[in-house]
Amino acid sequence: MALFRALYIIWVFLLIPLFNAEEFTPKVTRTLSRYVFDIVNFDDSNTLIRADEDSVEISFDAGENWKTIDGIEEPIESFVVDPFRGHDRAFAFVKTAPKFYVTDDQGKSWRPLTIPISEKASNYFCGITTHPIKKKHLIIRCDLLTINDSGVMHVGREIYTTNDGVSFSQVKPSFGKIDGHISTARCDFIKSSEDSDLGGNDASILCLFRNTEYIESTGSTIDKSELILSADGGETFKELVQFKDKVVRRYEILKYHVVVLTQDDMYNEMSSMDIWISNDVCTFQIAHTPTKIRHVNMGQIHEDSIGRIVLSVSRERDDEDSNQPGAAEVLISDSEGLKFLPIKWIPNNQFGYINVAYPGFLKGTFFGSFHPFIEYSDRKRKYSRQKVREETKVSVDNGLTWSNLKVVDRENVDSFGCDVTKPERCSLHTYFYDLRNLRPSAGIMMISGIVGDGSVYDWNEEKTFISRDSGLTWRLVHNSTGLYTTGDLGNIIMYIPYRSNENGDVPSKFYYSLDQGKTWGEYDLIMPIYPYRLISTISDGSGSKFILTGTSITDDPISITYSIDFSAVFDYKSCEEGDFEDWNLADGKCVNGAKYKYRRRKQDAQCLVKKAFKDLSLDETPCNSCTGSDYECSFEFVRDAKGDCIPDYNLIALSDICDKSKDKSVLVEPLQLIKGDKCKTPMKIEPVDIPCDEIPEEGSSDKEIVTTENKFDFEIKFYQYFDTVADESLVMLNSIGDAYISHDGGQTIKRFDTDGEKIVEVVFNPYFNSSAYLFGSKGNIFLTHDRGYSFMIAKLPEARQLGMPLDFSAKAQDTFIYYGGKNCESILSPECHAVAYLTKDGGETFTEMLDNAIHCEFAGTLFKYPSNDDMVMCQVKEKFSQTRSLVSSTDFFQDDKKTVFENIIGYLSTGGYIIVAVPHENNELRAYVTNDGAEFAEAKFPYDEDIGKQDAFTILGSEEGSIFLHLATNLESGHDFGNLLKSNSNGTSFVTLEHAVNRNTFGYVDFEKVQGLEGIIITNIVSNSEKVGEHKGDEQLKTKITFNDGSDWNFLKPPKKDSEGKKFLCDSVSLDKCSLHLHGYTERKDIRDTYSSGSALGMMFGVGNVGDRLLPYEECSTFLTTDGGETWTEVKKGPHQWEYGDHGGVLVLVPENAETDSISYSTDFGKTWKDYKFCGDKVLVKDVITVPRDSALRFLLFGEAKNMGSGSFRTYTIDFRNIFERQCEFDITGKKRADFKYSPLGSRTDCLFGHKTEFLRKTDEKCFIGNIPLSEFSRNVKNCSCTRQDFECDYNFYKASDGTCKLVKGLSSANGADICKKEPDLIEYYDSSGYRKIPLSTCKGGLKLDAHLAPHPCPGKEKAFREKYPINTGAYALVFVTILLVIFFAAWFVYDRGIRRNGGFSRFEEIRLGDDGLIENNRTDRVVNIIVRLGLCISLITKSAFQRAKAGTAQLSSKFRARFGNKKGATYSSLLHDQLSDAFQRAKAGTAQLSCFKI
């Protein structure tokens, strides 16, 4: 019986909480208002303030009653409670004026303060910073919004310091108002808290100003910043010298450290950053990071409980606007703040978003969640079969060890989709957003999340969970998500869902728990509410009153505020000593060298703590013995996979331990006690012997170069950078189909986890530089549009992968065509054929566009003026046929399909043209060209004696309105060559530029246009082409260069001496016998390698030799030119691989086909070279690359270390950033000192293409260029008159040895009337002069070799031609009459003054030369008499000649009659035509020596 009574008592005792919960009803008070947008509470009080639409209201009873505050009449923008005086002081900022109100008595009274803003604005957005000790010290920052008459918005920023409003002092940067705008203006007190350990006095202020100037011509920006410090409360400032020449992005003042982020490149706002750390605001040191940091989340620089700095690194700089959750990576420093390392529990080192939370009241506790980079929009939710799993973990030992969030919930165990008893495969996953505003409690917390294995995160399945042990174990409490908060140190928990049911109805009740989440009661609200805020009225979580705000769901929504009071629960009973228990953090283990515990109420106790306004108290007991968890790796060491600290030689080189030692080695302890650790007895640490002989000496440039090595078990077969300035992202693929991604030029590399699916191909979008597509072996395609940070998984159509490349739209990123095989059980099956599948949504859905299509182009997006924007062209190969046709459509072949050519070999697009190869009779080819997709014209190739059948041609590209084409004339394998042709502007008429240009069997040609410079082309010709064609010898190649787009060619001028200062063996004056020859495009291992770089203007590398012909590759050396090919220098003996960095500011050479441990580099444009040892063991470097724009300072080497077993394939990232003292200063206006100057390339100071151009070159090798777009700032300093070099030969004309263009014998010039057919609106046409102007030329005036002859009417346009060029008879008559009058007057004047006055014609024969009988009274008389004498002479000579001719003719006639009797005489022919023809030919020959004209 006694046992029964005891059980009964226990049962009743257990039910009491439930009865109390059901019987108790919190006191709820509702107030309605028009619009409540802000509500704040004073610390340790029941006073609240809220802003309504028209007024400011205050409550002194935790929100039950409200009244309007008198004295504040303007509309309020925001409230701020002083974080250091939260009990009594607050600020209210006015929206429409530079004004704010201050209260020092919990809102009972307010006083206005007006800020003396220098400029008027439409709106003012101000904030205030208070001092933790000095109450009167304030910093005010205001953003001034103005909108001009054109509607353009401008935001100005001003900062003031004030002594509680008595006086104001504006803080300004020294650069004042300049072009651009102040993008950053910020000031803070160095003392950020009462217990701050930073140096400096209490009045120290740190300010940052940053100006961003936009360069409209290039679309780039220039940043300038100033970081200044005041030691007297803002009265005077001085710039921090360490940051004088740097761009400071931002800073953060923490308790133990000041963190400053500087931008590496002032001309690239997305460039990497350095992290500077100081603990005294006097000296700053650069912290080491595993990779360069580019984007640090705003407001995401914090310190954890032991003072380590935590950085949240995002993929974009401004993450607030991103639809993606969280950061891309989280870095945590050592306790000194000088070395950062990433969180190591990320699965497979994959890329994804990371959220980290570390509640300040839970010492050593970290929460972390990892989410793979899969976009979470509704459109992509169907692709939830992610290849990387979600991970959510907790650590209670400062991140040393991590565990999954274990679900312990027997009641709901069957409601989860996995076995929660196996937390390694079934655990809780969440984002931890809710922990950011967590109220202090002894281990009690709530979060929203889902339970699973991490393969799917469905937002619709989120539920609410609770934990009582700081997150180690969790229990389900609600099958929905909503707002929640705690009171009475976790003993009161409130919860209201976002929606009350699956239909999304507005909540009409809230839930509460009085036993730490064990049981729940509910309360029905008077009015349903859409909740948006639920808070405790006391910020420290110790109170029992709450505020719930939201809006009503009515036609005219209003704001609802509920005040909820739990103070009467348990009949107002307060807890006694027996109602409490000890709760230990980290299960009682040592954390930071101490054990921590809280006193908290027992879960079932029938009382409240009721110690309102008293913070949660933590008990600390130092641990006696130090363990490994109390230590961290010393700066020079990093942890390996086993967790041991091992030496890192990059860190050793950065430190000064070897500089301080004179010995060859130094002893260093690998572990150091964590700063601030509480343990009493230190461990014994065995030092490690560090060799110093391999460490570069202090002051050497090698010490500043940083090399990072990565090892692979399989060879990297594919690699390609994304062509952007945002970062140095690239994709790599090894020989077994594993893909790797790096965002820092290969410094850190992570494998892309595809859940075992191999990647068979990687395709980059040529039109959108951040997009790439990875094809999986199981039919998946992995798409990225942000350079590999995130991926979307799409399922390819149910078709066999044929390995055909994707075809992309040039204007729509998500539109592309995929080719799959249909009926392809076997690839050799006759039924197997290709099908073109179209997607317009980035691969979410595919539609079958065209059967049997093997290659398509979005033609409408390629042409400048397309006939239809939606036009698509496809090459079709029907089943059971070898014939291919070209078809087009304007609706993706739904209803429109047009056959363009019935039979083609293939087609391609280049530079706004589409060129089609069409078979012709006798196994010849013909080319047809279009630039609008509608009209095709046959490409007319020039006649030449060495062009036979058109068997093969290669399109070499199109630039500046011309197509370059190589037409093969000899196709014998291994001895291929042909003619280099160039088209006119519409691509239809070609002329020969050079003969016997080398090509290989695959159609590649030794042809390369020098990037960034106009008209410079390098080719290799077969100098003995006739013998090769007759099989009488092997090819002998020679290198030629043109500086005027192919009109004139010359051999390369050889250097006088080699790299060792010795003269070359051949020194003939004739370049034909002694010139420089380079190996060309046909011999390249990687076709992406080029002589030149588009950013290193004028620079070219090549492997070749000096002599009469090109020697084999292994016998050649490496040459460099810096003036566009005019002069060359041998820089290294033997063949080398090369790469350009920093626009040519850094040049790198690596031996080719030879093992090495060093590279050679130059920072003075190749004048001098230095060697740098990048590895300990020699490796065979197979390639050296950098970003496509050659603007980076990091280079990536791919090598193979033979005979080294596992990991023999290596990559080396070599970073040259630190060898430069500063960034070059660039001033686009030219008004300020800069490190650049304009100069012509080489010695050429004459004109080229009708203008004289100068280019920017840096003048100081100690600075680096960065992202300055130098190629955009070339300038034309002079426009020139046209010369022979501005013209090339027209169609069917060839360049003769004398430099003139002559018509090919037996041919006629192009029929000018053909243009009338192509352009029906034309009225006239012109015949060719034999010359045409080079499209690149801008010359004006001067020589007009292309001057047209008289116009001719187009057929059928004769009437319009006569109307355009009418014959004006009146004008002709007027001119004729005028000429006759002038002649008549002149004749009369000569007769009157020279003949009549001197006796008339009767004296005509009496006048003799020198006769003084003529009247000469003045100069006019003398001139007239001279004319008379000349006339007399001519008359006498003519008369005499006529008489002689007459006599001779008579005599000759007599002889003829005597010989031939009465036979008919011969027909007389005039010699005039023949004589004039000979004279014309002689004159033409004389004037045709145009080569004598010089530019």
From Swiss-Prot:
One GO cellular component term noted in the UniProt record for this chain: membrane
Keywords: Glycoprotein, Golgi apparatus, Membrane, Protein transport, Receptor, Repeat, Signal, Transmembrane, Transmembrane helix, Transport
UniProt KW Repeat keyword: yes
Main location: Golgi
InterPro entries noted in UniProt: Sialidase_sf, Sortilin_C, Sortilin_N, VPS10, VPS10-sortilin, WD40/YVTN_repeat-like_dom_sf
GO biological process: Golgi to endosome transport; Golgi to vacuole transport; protein targeting to vacuole
UniProt-annotated glycosylation sites, renumbered to this chain: N148, N479, N769, N986, N1279
Its membrane topology: Single-pass type I membrane protein
Topological domains, Cytoplasmic: 1391-1495
Chain positions of BNR repeats: 58-67, 101-111, 229-238, 394-403, 465-475, 511-520, 740-750, 837-847, 1119-1129, 1161-1170
Pfam families to which the protein is assigned, alphabetical: Sortilin-Vps10, Sortilin_C
Endpoints of the signal sequence: 1-21
Keyword Transmembrane helix attached: yes
PANTHER family: SORTILIN RELATED (PTHR12106), SORTILIN-RELATED RECEPTOR (PTHR12106:SF27)
Protein name: VPS10 homolog 2
Source organism (scientific name): Saccharomyces cerevisiae (strain Lalvin EC1118 / Prise de mousse) (Baker's yeast)
